[in-house]
Amino acid sequence: MTVDYKNTLNLPETSFPMRGDLAKREPDMLKNWYEKNLYQKIRKASKGKKSFILHDGPPYANGNIHIGHAVNKILKDIIIKSKTALGFDSPYIPGWDCHGLPIELKVEGLVGKPNEKISAAEFRQKCREYASEQVEGQKKDFIRLGVLGDWDNPYLTMNFDTEANIIRTLGKVIENGHLYKGSKPVHWCLDCGSSLAEAEVEYEDKVSPSIYVRFPAESAVEIEAKFSAQGRGQGKLSAIIWTTTPWTMPSNRAIAVNADLEYNLVQLGDERVILAAELVESVAKAVGVEQVEILGSVKGADLELSRFHHPFYDFTVPVILGDHVTTDGGTGLVHTAPDHGLDDFIVGKQYDLPMAGLVSNDGKFISTTEFFAGKGVFEANPLVIEKLQEVGNLLKVEKIKHSYPHCWRHKTPIIFRATPQWFIGMETQGLRQQALGEIKQVRWIPDWGQARIEKMVENRPDWCISRQRTWGVPMTLFVHKETEELHPRTLELLEEVAKRVERAGIQAWWDLDEKELLGADAETYRKVPDTLDVWFDSGSTYSSVVANRLEFNGQDIDMYLEGSDQHRGWFMSSLMLSTATNSKAPYKQVLTHGFTVDGQGRKMSKSIGNIVTPQEVMDKFGGDILRLWVASTDYTGEMTVSDEILKRAADSYRRIRNTARFLLANLNGFDPKRDLVKPEEMISLDRWAVACALDAQNEIKDAYDNYQFHTVVQRLMRFCSVEMGSFYLDIIKDRQYTTKADSLARRSCQTALWHIAEALVRWMAPILSFTADEIWQHLPQTESARAEFVFTEEFYQGLFGLGEDEKLDDAYWQQLIKVRSEVNRVLEISRNNKEIGGGLEAEVTVYANDEYRALLAQLGNELRFVLITSKVDVKSLSEKPADLADSELEGIAVSVTRSNAEKCPRCWHYSDEIGVSPGHPTLCARCVENVVGNGEVRYFA
């Protein structure tokens, strides 16, 4: 009768499932986290530790979250959780940007425009309600990602206290002398009916008319004299400009040239024209004239204040000098309309050029505009061209495709338009230079972010912070009805208004009667009707939120983390406001991530049909797979996502999960309180495995600390698949399953597995949060009660390295790994040749040089357990048979033969010692010792 020895084996057993089934299990875990107040437990466990504050850049409260939102929130969550594990108190307060035009437009679509079907006050309330709904929808999706934070108490820019603090930030800007009112060209969206911030402008290709225009000389004789060209050439004499915005011609008030450039008077066909010398050839080619004659040359400075007739109005305009004039294109003479271009405005101020003021808020010419009254600016383009043709001053017209500014919301072309607005001056109180200095104090990740934002700050115009909108934080200022000067008690009045807003929200300002605060001054002062740019809202949260929430304990902000578009957005507005109010940057570190693209490197687009939504990914793969993809990807560049890439992430996940399951299954019956083996009593290979885990942990901690999450994943995978999976875990199966349950050989192994599991679960937690929680619930209890959640814990401190007196040190095991790899290679050849089945069917002879013979001899009979074969002989390399193939590892050669011994049914090893015990005639001697004796003794493996 055959005896079944299965019940004498220590077979692995765990309730930890093989399949993650994440999409199904994760929602239940989330429910448990929130029912048990996990976030508050983390705060309690971290209290008193050094703080690390990552301030959440608020997403806009409109629409569903997209894959870019998911990337952003997951990266933040990985940092927060890893900082907690590294010993920091790292609170996370999520936020939302709640004012502004997109919400206004949505609400207009639902209830109509303010002051038409609905009052402005009711409209604001509808906006508030709409934003609240959007916040709730986005919040559910962010929570589903496994992101931990104070979701019950987020910051909203429309919270009454935040609105009040935004107003207080405006007060500090004024107090420090950075605010002024001026009429200057700003980006103006015709659809918004409002000015736009730099960050709200996108550049897209647009087809525009390209025109060369004649400005006839007021005195041809005078111009001839300047060029020393009296009596030379023939025909009328004109200055030629080139523009792609014909609609700005009515506002032309000058022609700009560069003082240092050379200008030619040119015979161009039957007329004489002035052009930059470098551009004569290209202009002649553009207008179709083959032969030109240079009649004279002067420097641009010599043309200053010469006068030319406006092409179709009855006045003349001067030539002025400007450094912005180049020979990169056009004619080298620049049409100058101070209302419609920043360079034009700046140079115009130097020459006291008048502002034309011909275009109204709706983008139409005012009623007094000759020829074009009531016409929209883009509608006027063909009319201007027609008028130029009619008066004979159009030299050439064609179409050109070029990059042109568009509104980021409407995707429509915008214009530059001079309007009275409130500005933060970049030069007042040295703000620009101070901001540039502060940039150098910040750590930029990746480091090219520094040069990028420096260039933006160097070149940015004054910040127009006023908007003509309904749903926004009001500019709670009082100005003199005649002089437009701020009220002398402005700072005091701002604080009074802020207190009211704190109680009742921004509507308190609109409901305020001037007399309440101003008394008799109400006769001479009025309320400013403008609202603040939404970038002022979010840009001031370093103060309006962080400085005022108790969780942050008044600590400075360590990090801002957003997409790379925020160099000109939130990073910029925050830097400007913090420098203006606090004379320092609001952050110590700024980390930026790239945009998500599809598998072919294309942007996500409805029209292409390549959009990957986080909701779909979580429904199909689960949140942990999405998190693993984010962590695995180098966020410093474009982040490629596709179904195929997510499947690869799922494969990596399975390898990690299988490792964790192996650890848990083999900890079956292990009680650390009772069974833990001291390091010095552990078997050599087990000590080495724990030391490997320590090395991995040090590298992983360092990678987390430097935000190198793809390095964390790579190191985690190498540990699970290579160091553990293909070496250590493979070797210990025999010892784990076949030795006596309570033997040192087995308990030493379980001790190592327990230490490794305790470390591994913590390494995983910031990235694979759901799976780490699941593993944590399956780990054996320790002497002190295990914390309820892994997320309150720091990285494991129970790992230990190898002692200096360790004979079998890491270098030893690394050499042995090389030998084992070579043996496996030869075994694989034998398997493929059908000479053996598994490695245990083989008897291996290793022919080794003196160095390797000494190395292998140290393991004695236990070498076979490391090589996972039934028998190993080690011989001198000099005994190698002549016909034995060379090894790929210099210094050894390997031969494999099929064992003729019997197979032990319990351990599956082939042995000559089967049947030595009459009571167990089918077992090998080793198994008899493990079943009925004191158990085999292991020293090394």
Curated annotation (Swiss-Prot):
It catalyses: tRNA(Ile) + L-isoleucine + ATP = L-isoleucyl-tRNA(Ile) + AMP + diphosphate. Its cofactor is Zn(2+). One of its GO terms (cellular component) is cytosol. Zn(2+) binds at C904, C907, C924, C927. GO terms for molecular function: aminoacyl-tRNA deacylase activity; ATP binding; isoleucine-tRNA ligase activity; tRNA binding; zinc ion binding. L-isoleucyl-5'-AMP binds at E562. Keywords: Aminoacyl-tRNA synthetase, ATP-binding, Cytoplasm, Ligase, Metal-binding, Nucleotide-binding, Protein biosynthesis, Zinc. InterPro entries: aa-tRNA-synth_I_CS (IPR001412), aa-tRNA-synth_Ia (IPR002300), Anticodon_Ile_BEm (IPR033708), Ile-tRNA-ligase (IPR002301), Ile-tRNA-ligase_type1 (IPR023585), Ile-tRNA_ligase (IPR050081), M/V/L/I-tRNA-synth_anticd-bd (IPR013155), Rossmann-like_a/b/a_fold (IPR014729). Disulfide bonds: none annotated. Catalyzes the attachment of isoleucine to tRNA(Ile). As IleRS can inadvertently accommodate and process structurally similar amino acids such as valine, to avoid such errors it has two additional distinct tRNA(Ile)-dependent editing activities. One activity is designated as 'pretransfer' editing and involves the hydrolysis of activated Val-AMP. The other activity is designated 'posttransfer' editing and involves deacylation of mischarged Val-tRNA(Ile). This is Isoleucine--tRNA ligase. The gene is ileS.
